[in-house]
A protein has these predicted regions:
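Structural signature of hydrophobic alpha-helical transmembrane segments
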Residues: 27-40, 96-107, 150-159, 219-230, ...
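Juxtamembrane and boundary regions of transmembrane helices in multi-pass small-molecule transporters
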Residues: 2, 21, 175-178, 194-195, ...
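Re-entrant/interfacial helical elements at transmembrane boundaries that shape
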Residues: 124, 157-168, 181-182, 195-209, ...
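Hydrophobic transmembrane alpha-helices of multi-pass solute/ion transporters
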Residues: 38-110, 123-127, 131, 283, ...
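Membrane-interface alpha-helices at helix entry/exit sites of multi-pass transporters
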Residues: 126, 133-142, 171-183, 211-222, ...
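Hydrophobic core segments of alpha-helical transmembrane domains in multi-pass membrane transport
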Residues: 8-13, 38-50, 65-74, 105-113, ...
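N-terminal secretory/membrane targeting signals
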Residues: 1-20
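Membrane-embedded alpha-helical segments and adjacent helix-loop junctions characteristic
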Residues: 82-175, 324-386
Length: 453
């Protein structure tokens, strides 16, 4: 559920994203060994993209690829006579990024797990189900809720939470579930694009200081257009019917639920304040927030202790963090970093941004994000050291954030909902609406040009 709190977490953690500014690549892209590393990365990411079918956790092939890529990078550095210290500096650059990332995400995941255990998300799901909305009204409500929820949480959590509502209400109507899930994927990805806390790629751009915090809100209207265009087209295909009555009972929040939600928001504020005001790494602010949660957990466990029950155990919440996700990011950071050290990011930058121009290249980034996860794509763009103005950085933030909506496998939200839908929402049921989603993609780019260009 927490794979991407991801969504404002990663970018806060990368203090110096532009490798080209501080580290020199080997410029050995034409060697057999260099080409081999690219093939290794492609093969490993092929396994990531087929995780739904192979059930091989995405972290496993990417970590292996990262190790192989850096082993070959070290050999290439030795062959070129690069000092060991220089190679270590490039490697430690990636290590520093990942260490801060892991600690930051671990705290966020622990908070999300704590809120889930206190029935925060289940209570919201129950409330929506008990309202007994018609299918078309529910289509609009769930889409809007997902759009705004994903701007402060992440697209995966928002999609799974609201997706449970769609499944509960539309269990007997596969058509509604299918269209409703497409709607949620588009809404979740669009909602994360305009807020620095809404998507990892958005925060990566903010952390790299290519845009100020409030600059991203210039993308609100383009993001809304990106969602509204396909939603308007799909609305008329939604069954104009009333779902069957449900006997859903209200879910009660457990003691401390509201307090933990407030502490999570304060923890986020602390992390941002540590970075903005004190110039300290934001993961330190997150760790302070974790310590507060741990102390409050002790209070909950002692005050509400029931014999025979474990009670609130903060270390269980840490234990149930999504370690597959944390290790996946390890693989992404080191694999992309290794390719960058060999020289492939400079080569890609020359081909895309110098050959095609910034606007075309940034639009292509969104299209690539429909096939490849947007995090390594944006990580690569930032490490290219491309010289762009604010308009272009906001454009690539928008396209990388919403481009994944065009295919069900293009974002974490789509992949997760396919697994949740009991075969009612599939790759091909999503593909049916790709033209409408592509229309929203084009309309959002045009809107961005008209408003911010």
């Amino acid at each position: 559920m927490v794979r991407f709190l991801l969504v404002f977490l990663f970018a806060l953690l990368v203090p110096e994203m532009v490798m080209a500014e501080s580290l020199t690549s080997l410029d050995m892209t034409g060697t057999q060994r260099g080409i081999f590393t690219v093939l290794i990365f492609i093969i490993s990411y092929g396994f990531v993209m087929t995780e739904e079918f192979t059930h091989l956790r995405k972290s496993k092939p990417v970590i292996l690829a990262a190790g192989i890529i850096w082993a070959h990078a070290a050999i290439l550095a030795a062959e070129k006579g690069v000092p060991t210290e220089q190679m270590h500096a490039a490697f430690e650059h990636d290590l520093k990024e990942y260490a801060e990332l892991m600690l930051f995400l671990l705290v966020a995941m622990t908070y999300i797990n704590s809120m889930a255990e206190r029935n925060v998300f289940e209570a919201l799901r129950s409330w929506l189900v008990r309202r007994q909305f018609g299918y078309r009204k529910l289509f609009l409500i769930t889409g809007v809720i997902t759009f705004f929820l994903s701007s402060v949480a992440d697209n995966l959590t928002a999609a799974l939470l609201v997706g449970a509502v769609v499944m509960a209400v539309g269990a007997d109507n596969p058509k509604f579930v299918s269209i409703g899930f497409v709607n949620l994927v588009v809404a979740a990805n669009a909602g994360g694009a305009f807020c620095p806390f809404g998507d990892i790629t958005t925060l990566m751009v903010w952390q790299a200081e290519y845009a100020e915090f409030f600059d991203f809100f210039k993308l609100f209207i383009p993001s809304a257009v990106n969602y509204a265009v396909p939603a308007a087209v799909m609305y008329f295909a939604v069954p104009d019917e009333q779902p069957k009555e449900t006997n859903e009972e209200a879910v009660q929040l457990k003691p401390g639920a509201i307090q933990i939600c407030v502490m999570f928001l304060l923890t986020i504020a602390t992390a941002v304040s540590f970075k903005q005001a004190l110039h300290l790494p934001p993961f330190m602010g997150m760790m302070v927030g974790l310590s507060v949660l741990m102390i409050y957990g002790y209070f909950l466990k002692t005050k509400y202790y029931v014999e025979g029950e474990d009670g609130f155990d903060i270390f269980n919440k840490v234990r149930h963090a999504e370690w597959d996700t944390l290790l996946f990011f390890f693989g992404v950071v080191f694999a992309v970093g290794g390719l960058g050290y060999i020289g492939y990011l400079e080569l890609l930058s020359s081909a895309m941004y110098e050959g095609l121009g910034a606007t075309t290249a940034n639009i292509m980034v969104g299209l690539i994000s429909a096939i490849v996860d947007n995090i390594p794509v944006m990580f690569a763009v930032l490490n290219m050291g491309v010289d762009m103005d604010l308009y272009q950085w906001l454009l690539v933030t928008l396209t990388a954030g919403v481009g994944g909506s065009m295919l069900s496998v293009g974002s974490a939200a789509g992949v997760a909902l396919m697994g949740q839908s009991d075969h009612k929402y599939t790759f091909f049921s999503h593909l049916k609406w790709t033209p409408a989603i592509a229309g929203g993609y084009a309309a959002s780019i045009l809107t961005h040009y008209l408003i911010n260009g």
